[in-house]
Amino acid sequence: MASVCGTPSPGGALGSPAPAWYHRDLSRAAAEELLARAGRDGSFLVRDSESVAGAFALCVLYQKHVHTYRILPDGEDFLAVQTSQGVPVRRFQTLGELIGLYAQPNQGLVCALLLPVEGEREPDPPDDRDASDVEDEKPPLPPRSGSTSISAPVGPSSPLPTPETPTTPAAESTPNGLSTVSHEYLKGSYGLDLEAVRGGASNLPHLTRTLVTSCRRLHSEVDKVLSGLEILSKVFDQQSSPMVTRLLQQQSLPQTGEQELESLVLKLSVLKDFLSGIQKKALKALQDMSSTAPPAPLQPSIRKAKTIPVQAFEVKLDVTLGDLTKIGKSQKFTLSVDVEGGRLVLLRRQRDSQEDWTTFTHDRIRQLIKSQRVQNKLGVVFEKEKDRTQRKDFIFVSARKREAFCQLLQLMKNRHSKQDEPDMISVFIGTWNMGSVPPPKNVTSWFTSKGLGKALDEVTVTIPHDIYVFGTQENSVGDREWLDLLRGGLKELTDLDYRPIAMQSLWNIKVAVLVKPEHENRISHVSTSSVKTGIANTLGNKGAVGVSFMFNGTSFGFVNCHLTSGNEKTTRRNQNYLDILRLLSLGDRQLSAFDISLRFTHLFWFGDLNYRLDMDIQEILNYISRREFEPLLRVDQLNLEREKHKVFLRFSEEEISFPPTYRYERGSRDTYAWHKQKPTGVRTNVPSWCDRILWKSYPETHIICNSYGCTDDIVTSDHSPVFGTFEVGVTSQFISKKGLSKTSDQAYIEFESIEAIVKTASRTKFFIEFYSTCLEEYKKSFENDAQSSDNINFLKVQWSSRQLPTLKPILADIEYLQDQHLLLTVKSMDGYESYGECVVALKSMIGSTAQQFLTFLSHRGEETGNIRGSMKVRVPTERLGTRERLYEWISIDKDDTGAKSKVPSVSRGSQEHRSGSRKPASTETSCPLSKLFEEPEKPPPTGRPPAPPRAVPREEPLNPRLKSEGTSEQEGVAAPPPKNSFNNPAYYVLEGVPHQLLPLEPPSLARAPLPPATKNKVAITVPAPQLGRHRTPRVGEGSSSDEDSGGTLPPPDFPPPPLPDSAIFLPPNLDPLSMPVVRGRSGGEARGPPPPKAHPRPPLPPGTSPASTFLGEVASGDDRSCSVLQMAKTLSEVDYAPGPGRSALLPNPLELQPPRGPSDYGRPLSFPPPRIRESIQEDLAEEAPCPQGGRASGLGEAGMGAWLRAIGLERYEEGLVHNGWDDLEFLSDITEEDLEEAGVQDPAHKRLLLDTLQLSK
């Protein structure tokens, strides 16, 4: 490779450091930031190219813009700046020569290279090596051959540590954490070895001498341990070979340096064999000596049968107050689930001790509907006759029992499905820092997700998962022995012989993946990789290991990491994460332009992340003793760094409801050992959630976390094992029944326009690359045909349809295309480097009319902008057939007012996806937008505000006919049209509008007539956000499971920045007149959502606009990562021309945004889950049309206010409307709890309201 300054490597030789202007691993975004800080024309730096290995990028600042020039090596290793055609090429031997020439004026660059820009070099604290690269003290164990722990360095005055020369803390610290012995070699003897090699020497005598000197103490320690182990081995095995004796005898003979090293390696190998075999020898000897049968294990575990026994659940029938009056008391049922037989038996006990039972086969159970408000309530829809259903609502003993019942029914459906390939699998993720101690004999609680936090119910713990992934750190067990231990434990637990798919190790960091035997042939494209993140990313005991594979048509990635320790090492942990993200080589090689967070349908990231709590130790212990975890989660470093968008951008994590897993006293889970003796003194290790499991999934995919907790009975380590179980939707290797697509039978992906706002000071041209598994090869667009900038740090680039390619999927079937995703990367024309990547789901883009999309751009783990566009996926009519997925069977009833409120949708069966006809039809109903999403406020940097009490809003029914016909036992009611819903905050589809960006209605549009609703058009209802802690995404009853039961949970970051004026569209079915009326303080009326109950946005200073406030936030603080994209809102002043049938633009969203509330930290760092309700109505023409501009029910807030005034309780109108009780027709279902949530606390007032409603029935 060409050199930087006459040295063999770009960074220069070790003896001659690289010049200040050269930055080896600097990213493009970081380079632009350094140049922006320099601020003077002619400032420059050189970094490695991100697009071409071995090439460089010269970045120059001129007139506040960054200009990038590629420096490419030729076949003779000469360097040259890439030039336009016809310009003569100048070649240089080194980068130093090249920079020297271009430092002169008029050499062809935009300006001369005047001011070299150096990187930021933050000095490490004196105890850096001690805190970062050596973990907690371990119990006395023999050294292991696999250990790579760095021994403590010594001072310069003592090259060899001896017992007579104690080291001092001052002598412990050395540059870069390297020992003084190594440092002295690099300074002096390295040159002598170099000269010897140039002279033809085949060995390195000085390096050998250095290694022998460094390992002399290790020699003696290994000899002692080997001698003791040999004696112990002979006790149990008389035939043991006297290997150690021979080794010690050989050592007494004079040896050269190389012979000493070979002897040490041999000893370590013998030591490894001794340690791995001595337990087996001892067990065999003791068993032979025993006259009775071999003793049973200390904690015997019962072998589980392969079949799942019938499970019974005690429930009560949930009925309305009127029905309860007729019946006399609530009826008790026993629900018996026979998974193997595919039956559900409802057993009702009669008063005369007789029993009445009804049996439903699996195919007659049409849907499960989870209540959002009552966590232990479940609605079950049964098929009584053809196309006629009956719903019963049951109250379980606990929410955990309800979840167990749902899992068993889901398993029953899966087991008896007629599909050849599964739609859904279960995945177990486990992470454990073992503390360099062998595991105990019994780790069943870890395998079965039993312990503290969100654990599985006893009924479901024995159900085997499809995939088990075990990540361990400081695991001293050998790879083969560890794999055998895992397989043996699973065999004993499940009677299944799980097959190992992959095992990857880095030092003592290991990841093992095992799958059910039946899935072995469904696994393909297995890949493994590892990354070191220790000293200089080469030494130490920290890093990551990863495994990836395809399960049929779904890609999975698993990363197990061990990051830098120490309370104060947050920045280094962040860098560890970014290094792993960039360097871990997993997945499809064709996707090398994307980091691993975008290469997989589902990516799981777990391990000992080592993020700590920023709080006084006594406060932490007090909160833990009271089991108050919310205040601790607010100061959790990982949550705070995710909030700043520093790490794990848009990853998800389940709610933490278990105590910190580190640092316990070994042998107990009752005491935290927070004092630790280090060579540099006593160190405080506060209890922390070091061990975590996070995940990131593509938009519009299905994933639910069923458990997340830690064990409380495994005490050998100072960490508790952590477990998480997931229900994951998968796709099959699709085979079209109609064969390959012909020219006349081809699907097309067509783009009308794309616009991106990119964080950059460059003004180059850009193009887009499109990748997808549904394409034969990746495609490129032409360069953008328009660009503009109103801010020096951002650039808006636009492509029209002429610049964008038409993509042709390899298969045209909708069942195949609705599971596909499109990866986009925005690249520059000058350096072909990526400025941002994203993923878009095709599912919501299918249809004959163009749909809008909006999502984030990110690069190397950093948010770099956003991108939006208009596209459609055209599918031939004869290939529109689709089927229901198993995970669409369970939904959430977020408008849970009892069984009368709605009729759930039933299984779609052989429903056809009819999105091709989207033309206006005046006879169809229009369903208004009843609530606007309230965007959360950016929290202060010092901590997170407490979440206010949550209130479950009411959503307006989409179908007026269903309101009057729904009953608790809906016999004789035909099933309504099926509904479909997509909910993924990492990607927004709302007729082109991200839900939280919808503005309040402008006065100019207050009386504007609406376009008529369209056939099969998506009807949307966006209720007010849930700001409290939550476990389950709040979604609508009857929706598809993409939203209802885990369609990719909210990402752990803030909502995207509001787009410029042109970004906001009014959905065609938005009725301005149906917006809730909120009375302001002045007594006037304003249409839009009611203001939040608490934490309003603080008033702005006089003369300050919202835009200037955001810009001020950027300028005032050093950490600009949270607000950098918010600056992009000032860029676009050009209208984004809507296509045919699309609505007009709205005024500036900066003036129309609803007030922000506090961020939701229930699921750490996830903003309040959006609830976009999209129902594809197939038979809307049959419904009674609503009057133009009127409410679907015919009764609005006006009727509510008149009724309240009539009984003298008008004071509660605002509270009731704010909580969704804005319709008299549904007010009859209100309960005392609902009234309290709406602010009715007076018992007499509550009684009056309920009695009046009862009489009105």
Swiss-Prot record:
Motif segment (SH3-binding): 945-950
PROSITE patterns, A to Z: SAM_DOMAIN, SH2
Tissue: Widely expressed.
Basic and acidic residues bias locations: 119-132, 952-966
Compositional bias per record (Pro residues), positions renumbered to this chain: 156-166, 939-951, 1049-1060, 1088-1104
Membrane topology of the entry: Peripheral membrane protein
Notes on activation and inhibition: Activated upon translocation to the sites of synthesis of PtdIns(3,4,5)P3 in the membrane. Enzymatic activity is enhanced in the presence of phosphatidylserine.
Record keyword Signal present: no
Alphabetical list of InterPro entries matching this protein: Endo/exonu/phosph_ase_sf, IPPc, SAM, SAM/pointed_sf, SH2, SH2_dom_sf
Annotated SH2 domain residues: 21-117
Phenotype of null mutants: Mice are viable, have normal glucose and insulin levels, and normal insulin and glucose tolerance. They are however highly resistant to weight gain when placed on a high-fat diet, suggesting that inhibition of Inppl1 would be useful in the effort to ameliorate diet-induced obesity. According to preliminary results from PubMed:11343120, mice display increased sensitivity to insulin, characterized by severe neonatal hypoglycemia, deregulated expression of the genes involved in gluconeogenesis, and perinatal death.
Main location: cytoplasm
Induction notes from the record: Overexpressed in diabetic db/db mice.
Phosphotyrosine modified-residue sites: Y887, Y987, Y1136, Y1161
GO molecular function, one term: actin binding
Region span, Disordered: 119-181, 897-986, 999-1119, 1134-1196
Keyword Iron: no
Post-translational modification: Tyrosine phosphorylated by the members of the SRC family after exposure to a diverse array of extracellular stimuli such as insulin, growth factors such as EGF or PDGF, chemokines, integrin ligands and hypertonic and oxidative stress. May be phosphorylated upon IgG receptor FCGR2B-binding. Phosphorylated at Tyr-987 following cell attachment and spreading. Phosphorylated at Tyr-1161 following EGF signaling pathway stimulation.
The family this protein is said to belong to: Belongs to the inositol 1,4,5-trisphosphate 5-phosphatase family.
Assembly mode: Interacts with tyrosine phosphorylated form of SHC1. Interacts with EGFR. Upon stimulation by the EGF signaling pathway, it forms a complex with SHC1 and EGFR. Interacts with cytoskeletal protein SORBS3/vinexin, promoting its localization to the periphery of cells. Forms a complex with filamin (FLNA or FLNB), actin, GPIb (GP1BA or GP1BB) that regulates cortical and submembraneous actin. Interacts with c-Met/MET, when c-Met/MET is phosphorylated on 'Tyr-1356'. Interacts with p130Cas/BCAR1. Interacts with CENTD3/ARAP3 via its SAM domain. Interacts with c-Cbl/CBL and CAP/SORBS1.
Database matches in PANTHER family: PHOSPHATIDYLINOSITOL 3,4,5-TRISPHOSPHATE 5-PHOSPHATASE 2, SH2 DOMAIN-CONTAINING PROTEIN
Domain comment (free text): The SH2 domain interacts with tyrosine phosphorylated forms of proteins such as SHC1 or FCGR2A. It also mediates the interaction with p130Cas/BCAR1. The NPXY sequence motif found in many tyrosine-phosphorylated proteins is required for the specific binding of the PID domain.
The protein's name in its UniProt record: Phosphatidylinositol 3,4,5-trisphosphate 5-phosphatase 2
